[in-house]
Amino acid sequence: MGTNYRRVLLKLSGEALMGNMGYGIDPEVVKEIAQEIAEVIATGVQIAIVVGGGNIFRGVKAASAGMDRATADYIGMIATVMNAMTLQDSLERIGVQTRVQTAIAMQELAEPYIRRRAIRHLEKGRVVIFGAGSGNPFFTTDTTAALRAAEIDAEVIFKATKVDGVYDADPEVYPNAKRYNSLTYAHVLAQDLRVMDSTAIALCKENNIPILVFDLTTRGNIRRAVLGESIGTLVGGSCEIS
């Protein structure tokens, strides 16, 4: 079965791991995500993952409540490592070799982030999960995803969310909101469509890395994305606005 990509970076929000629980990690949701990733790995596609931590702790929210912003962001980084280790466990229990690499040294728990080692793991068919964000406060995990994608030469970023693409307005508030099939980086930035934060979009634009935004809750969508099926919204430099 042919695939459209050789190496992809999958961006998972922390919220994607909590399902309908409202907080924390839903083991069944993580299991389903792991099974989808295993199916994609079986096609020969290399997968790296950046996972958020918003299901456990949100640094921006804590900072707005009075916590020191840098401290809040570091706590959020630790939350991403908890999610990374949970996903690693779920993947390895179904036979998918997985390595967690963290931007902050946690030698008893994970490898340090080393670009060449990460690429070597991918070449050997292992999943690599990047935890602890970029290791720096004031940067989002979306920006980390763009940075890591550029570093490992990923061909695309899959941003798996709870909505089925990018809309011109919040579809939960405006039922008639229009979903885009494709967008340019410039339009996303000009219209502040919040596909990712502006730093992440700028990094993707500079390095010509397309972003596919799609619904993770629909079973099989990761595989569909890899096969090039028409799902979600594609953001890129040469995309038409439609």
Swiss-Prot record:
Record carries keyword Transferase: yes
Region described as Involved in allosteric activation by GTP: 19-24
Activity control mechanisms: Allosterically activated by GTP. Inhibited by UTP.
GO molecular function, one term: UMP kinase activity
Compartment annotation: Cytoplasm
Annotated catalysed reactions: UMP + ATP = UDP + ADP
UniProt cross-references to Pfam families, sorted A to Z: AA_kinase (PF00696)
Residues where ATP binds: 11-14, 54, 58, 161, 167, 170
UniProt pathway: Pyrimidine metabolism; CTP biosynthesis via de novo pathway; UDP from UMP (UMPK route): step 1/1
An annotated GO cellular component: cytoplasm
Keywords: Allosteric enzyme, ATP-binding, Cytoplasm, Kinase, Nucleotide-binding, Pyrimidine biosynthesis, Transferase
Binding locations of UMP: 53, 73, 134-141
Entry's EC annotation: 2.7.4.22
UniProt cross-references to PANTHER family, sorted A to Z: URIDYLATE KINASE, URIDYLATE KINASE PUMPKIN, CHLOROPLASTIC
Protein role: Catalyzes the reversible phosphorylation of UMP to UDP.
HAMAP family xref list: PyrH_B
Protein name, UniProt field: Uridylate kinase
Gene symbol of the encoding locus: pyrH
